[in-house]
Amino acid sequence: MTGKAPFFVILIAALLLLSSFFFGEVKAISTKQPKHRKLGNREGDENRSNEIVVQMKARVKRSKSKRGPQKKEPYKKPPCSPPTHPA
């Protein structure tokens, strides 16, 4: 029994080390999910506001045309062919 005891100790220690490694990965994946708002996490609100700002900047960049802003011609009313009022 004494010959197998160190083997079990090493096995248990290795399993503990590996399990902490795997749980670390699970934590890294689970932090990407949105957090519940009732927790009052100010960090999550900051990230959310930053995302909104980035989206607004991206929308502004897409709306510009390649040739630059162009002036629209104002609408000109066509002159009436039979003059109904004196000019």
Swiss-Prot record:
Q: Which residues form the signal peptide?
A: 1-28
MF (Gene Ontology): LRR domain binding; receptor serine/threonine kinase binding
Judging by the UniProt lineage, the source's domain of life is Eukaryota
* Predominant place of localization: membrane
Please provide the record's keywords in A-Z order: Apoplast, Cell membrane, Cleavage on pair of basic residues, Membrane, Secreted, Signal
Coordinates of motif SxS motif essential for MIK2 binding in the sequence?
Answer: 63-65
Residue ranges for the region (Disordered) are: 32-87
KW Cell membrane (keyword) present = yes
Bias (Basic and acidic residues) occurs at 40-49
**Where's it found, cell-wise?**
Cell membrane; Secreted, Extracellular space, Apoplast
One Gene Ontology cellular component term attached to this UniProt record is: apoplast
- Entry annotated with the keyword rRNA-binding: no
| Composition bias type Basic residues, residue spans | 58-69
> Quaternary structure?
Interacts with MIK2 (via extracellular leucine-rich repeat domain); this interaction triggers the formation of complex between MIK2 and the BAK1/SERK3 and SERK4 coreceptors, and subsequent BAK1 activation by phosphorylation.
Explain the purpose of this protein. Answer: Brassicaceae-specific phytocytokine (plant endogenous peptide released into the apoplast) perceived by MIK2 in a BAK1/SERK3 and SERK4 coreceptors-dependent manner, that modulates various physiological and antimicrobial processes including growth prevention and reactive oxygen species (ROS) response regulation.
What name goes with this protein? Serine rich endogenous peptide 17
Species name for this entry?
A: Arabidopsis thaliana
